[in-house]
Regions:
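Conserved GNAT acetyl-CoA-binding A-motif
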Residues: 108, 136-150
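A secondary-structure capping/hinge motif
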Residues: 169-171
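Terminal substrate-recognition subdomain of acyl/acetyltransferases
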Residues: 2-20, 173-175, 182-193
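Acetyl-CoA-dependent GNAT
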Residues: 19, 58-118, 129, 135, ...
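C-terminal "cap" of GNAT-fold acetyltransferases
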Residues: 145-148, 152-159, 164, 175-193
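A short, well-structured alpha-helix characteristic of acyl/acetyltransferase catalytic modules
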Residues: 6-59
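Conserved acetyl-CoA-binding loop-helix of GNAT-fold acetyltransferases
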Residues: 115, 121-138, 160-164
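Hydrophobic adenine-recognition pocket in adenosine-nucleotide-binding enzymes
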Residues: 29, 113-115, 151
């Protein structure tokens, strides 16, 4: 199979799953997505507008989103990262990724997930978590032995989701994130594979 013809490392095919009565397509990030940066920008910027507990707090420009997509596809091509997209009616409603940390931490994959507000609490986040971990084991070289994540200590629904999927809290660093004018802690969690 030629992995460069628009479908980079396509061992994960698109799947349609039903969550709370909504047909959601789960698929890998594709080269053709470079032509659609606006739909990804709208998704990310919706989280900023919502004031979600995510690390970034500034809306992205179209140029910044294009650069992000290009860099992510480059990581996928090098087998250094995996990235999946959840879409409902062609609107991005969630993403999940794992990227190898590199060098002496090449056995560690950094996990990230974002889900649009109206799609939380319906099982989508858990499904994306399972799928991205499975995909990381198939595609990343070297295969990660540890998945690491960082989350706002105040984001209890996310922490509970991660615990449900086997992540263990290993550290809480106080005053690492600024949220709503206050400093809040950062919780570090690991999943040993």
């Amino acid at each position: 199979m030629d992995l460069q013809k628009g479908n980079l490392f396509l061992t994960m095919l698109a799947k349609i799953k039903i969550f709370n009565g909504k047909k959601i397509t789960i698929r890998p990030l594709l080269k053709k997505d470079l032509k659609l940066p606006e739909k990804f920008r709208k998704f990310i910027n919706s989280l900023i507008t919502e004031n979600a507990q995510v690390a970034f707090n500034k809306k992205l420009s179209l140029k910044e989103e294009r650069i992000f997509l290009k860099n992510t596809l480059s990581q996928i091509k090098k087998r250094f990262g995996v990235f999946i997209v959840a879409e409902h009616n062609k609107i991005v409603v969630g993403t999940a990724s794992i990227t190898l940390k590199g060098n002496r931490q090449n056995h560690v994959g950094e996990y990230g997930i974002t889900v649009r507000k109206d799609y939380r609490g319906i099982g989508l986040g858990g499904y994306l978590t399972e799928e991205i971990i499975k995909l990381s084991q198939k595609q990343l070289k070297p295969t990660p032995k540890i998945i690491r994540l960082s989350v706002f200590s105040t984001n209890k629904p996310a922490i509970n989701l991660y615990k449900k999927h086997g992540f263990k809290k290993v550290a809480e660093i106080p005053n690492q994130m600024e949220y709503n004018g206050k400093l809040v802690g950062e919780t570090i969690m690991l999943l040993q594979l």
